[in-house]
């Protein structure tokens, strides 16, 4: 089970900022690299969206087409984790309750459970797999347990109008399926991570549990590639840097949202890019641009 107490303690410093070393007359210059990098992608035909807010002040630091709706791939699994955590808090089911994988849940790509022999796992372990490896099979089993309608209702109750988990995970999408696993606006996603970091989503325990699951995330290939953290072990503070994030990857889609705390400040952020993934150079340009966003965020929090 994820240690909720340690998760809470790691984020307590969000409420006690210190004067930043790199602040000047204004902070806009800290994101000049971001504007240039994402601008180049847009010039090449990609759709880009980005948002960042200061966790202590609520101040908007970055807003680039932050209200448009773009595909966000596996980021939508965050909404499922919120619903699962809320039900655990309400004791509608137990974290130790065992769920079986079935043939209709089967799906490939991301995740570990499809490669394991265990036919059944506890609810809390499945949520940890989703948080840690974006496990597709665990996602489908949890969705079967709670229902997509319940996830949608929870999403609406949070006031999210442009962000949604649309479907279960599929190896291929037909004409009768939702065209994307999830969609979202970066403004809403950065707000959501800010609210989670402040323990404001549903209640304190629910928020902390979700942050604990997400702290296991092993995908640091996008924005977080700039933070110098160990992808397999970064639940604690490393060089005064603490990260909790969720990523989404599909053909022509790269998206990331998260919360980052440094020695001086903390931010919630989200970046989405939809692009023509017609070759490795195009994909690498997107990843390099997202890394540039990460470098600007790192500069801001330290």
Predicted regions, residues:
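Mid-domain, small-residue-enriched loop/turn segments at the edges of structured enzyme/sensor domains
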Residues: 45-48, 143-198
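Short glycine/serine- and small hydrophobic-enriched flexible loop segments
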Residues: 82-90, 144, 191-198, 299
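A short glycine/serine-rich beta->alpha loop
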Residues: 63-71, 112, 116, 175-178, ...
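Short, conserved catalytic-motif segment at the N-terminal edge
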Residues: 44-69
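Conserved catalytic neighborhood of penicillin-recognizing serine enzymes
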Residues: 106-140, 179
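Short, glycine/proline-biased beta-turn/loop segments that scaffold the active-site neighborhood
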Residues: 90-116
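Structured C-terminal helix/loop/strand segments within mature extracytoplasmic catalytic/sensor domains
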Residues: 2-42, 61, 196-230, 237-302
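Active-site SXXK
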Residues: 58, 71-99, 269
